[in-house]
Amino acid sequence: MTGKGCIIELKNVSKIFEDTCALDNINLQIANGEFLTLLGPSGCGKTTILRIISGFETPDVGEILIAGVNVSGFPPERRQVNTVFQHYALFPHMTVRDNVAFGLRMQKCPREKVNELVFEALRMVHLENFADRRPSQLSGGQQQRVAIARAVVNKPLLLLLDEPFSALDHKLRQIMQLEIKHLQRKLGITFVFVTHDQEEAFAMSDRVVVMNQGRIEQIGTPQCIYEEPVNLFVARFVGEINNLAGTILSCNDEGIYEAAIANEVFPLRTPHRFSPGEAVNVLLRPEDIRIYLLDEEVLKVPHLRGRIEETVYKGATVDIIIALDVGGTLRVAEFFNEDDAEISYNEGERVAVTWVDGWEVVLPHEMA
């Protein structure tokens, strides 16, 4: 957690629905002013955490603390927490202004104060000129902004966002990601965001919580999660990964291991401790692998051999699929430069592959 002080804490929280364990002993601290994302596949428990924080669900075991107060038995209206849902839940018969003002009026806020706060909220989301329109007269992105304005107008301690971009197209999602991140920084409110989209999580978050089957697999910065995954599930969920099976042979005085991978011996750098003979997974991101022709200097260093099976042009990058002589394939990503002839590979061409020294992730063996 960052050094800003804890605003939300979940202590030993568990929740069971019928025969399904939705949350299994969750412990999580969220810093004041932090943008934290719960990332994981459908059914992993991330939305259940949101509902428990907001008060729409009650944990079977554990406590929820907001600003140091145990709110486990508090109803939603006493928690100073607002939620933006997937489908916005705007009132179709009300104007934008009235939608944003609804909560303030329910709280008996004075009319002048309501008008002031509503205008401020709409201005922050660039909709001050749309106050008299109805939701049906707005685009999907504009409806999204109205929902966010309504959620922040009363300045809650915490804003929860449950996959709010799911109904938007890819380009609009990217625009909204930047707008939400900027708005959160401006407001200083703690945001807890739920998504199954790794790129979305990485683009917006101070920290990411990767979840699977009701458990937290890893918590860290986007860079830490991507570059230092703690297990195969995390490595695969947050991007493309190549998995090579290896066996530890030895370790020198500098802590560099030697491992047998296929028919070669490779040096491996890792903070983990292994014993000779131990099986490991050597994980490589596609962008960390290098391709060479067989007559190049790479033949003097450890490498694997194979042939080009397929190339996939993606605009900024080209994906190259290599069928290894020892079996299996590697996916390699190279940045595309139309002036660079070296990125042109022919199907069936023989190549050697190695990787950037020290960029491998070495983990205890798990079944693939």
From Swiss-Prot:
Q: Which residues bind ATP?
A: G40, P41, S42, G43, C44, G45, K46, T47
Query: Domain ABC transporter spans what residues?
Result: 8-238
The family database entries (SMART domains) matched by this protein are listed as:
AAA
Q: Where is this protein localized, as stated in its record?
A: Cell membrane
Q: Which GO terms describe its molecular function?
A: ABC-type putrescine transporter activity; ATP binding; ATP hydrolysis activity
Coiled-coil intervals, chain numbering: none
Give the enzyme class: translocase
Location, primary (coarse class):
membrane
State the similarity comment. Answer: Belongs to the ABC transporter superfamily. Spermidine/putrescine importer (TC 3.A.1.11.1) family.
Task: Outline the subunit composition.
Answer: The complex is composed of two ATP-binding proteins (PotA), two transmembrane proteins (PotB and PotC) and a solute-binding protein (PotD).
**Known role:** Part of the ABC transporter complex PotABCD involved in spermidine/putrescine import. Responsible for energy coupling to the transport system.
Name it.
Answer: Spermidine/putrescine import ATP-binding protein PotA
Q: Which organism is it from?
A: Lawsonia intracellularis (strain PHE/MN1-00)
| Lineage of source species | Bacteria, Pseudomonadati, Thermodesulfobacteriota, Desulfovibrionia, Desulfovibrionales
